[in-house]
A protein has these predicted regions:
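Amphipathic alpha-helical dimerization/coiled-coil segments
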Residues: 17-21, 101-130
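N-terminal helix-turn-helix DNA-binding core of bacterial DNA-binding proteins
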Residues: 19-58
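Canonical helix-turn-helix DNA-binding module
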Residues: 46-88
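N-terminal leader segment of winged-helix/HTH proteins
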Residues: 1-28, 125-130
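Basic, amphipathic "hinge/linker" alpha-helix immediately C-terminal to the N-terminal HTH DNA-binding motif
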Residues: 82-103
Length: 130
């Protein structure tokens, strides 16, 4: 498989994943919220607002807004760091763990699906019939 084929496959998997997330019942996460959630759940060490901001190269207020929304959805919880009361630790929740597990399944299904532009025989947008 060539590099271009790999890229098309990845784009197709991403598209299928995003479409499935949009269609399902549940919270509609922004790209930033999803990046914060994935970082919190896929990194082994505890995450802080400061650390997330550095890792994702965004401002602390942007991380705080994303965490506010994720906390509203009960996907993360904040706790003051007992060793440094100025720092806030981001904790995982059962609902967030379930979302990540479901996301993995959605991605597996999307990876097996038809490539981009081949959804049920529909033509790729922007292409004229020949």
């Amino acid at each position: 498989m060539s590099g271009s084929d790999d890229t098309e496959s990845l784009v197709g998997t991403l598209r299928g994943t995003v479409v499935a997330l949009v269609r399902r019942d549940g919270p509609d996460l922004s790209a930033r919220q999803l990046a914060v959630l994935l970082t919190c759940y896929l990194e082994s060490e505890a995450q802080t607002v400061r650390g997330l901001a550095a890792t994702l190269d965004v401002s602390k207020p942007a991380i705080t807004r994303a965490l506010d929304r994720l906390a509203d959805f009960d996907m993360v919880r904040r706790k003051t760091d007992p060793t440094d009361r100025r720092s806030v630790l981001v904790q995982r929740t059962p609902k967030g763990t379930t979302f990540i597990r479901d996301l993995r399944g959605i991605m597996k299904e999307a990876a097996k699906a038809k490539p981009v532009g081949d959804a049920g025989g529909r033509k790729k947008p922007g292409r004229a019939a020949r």
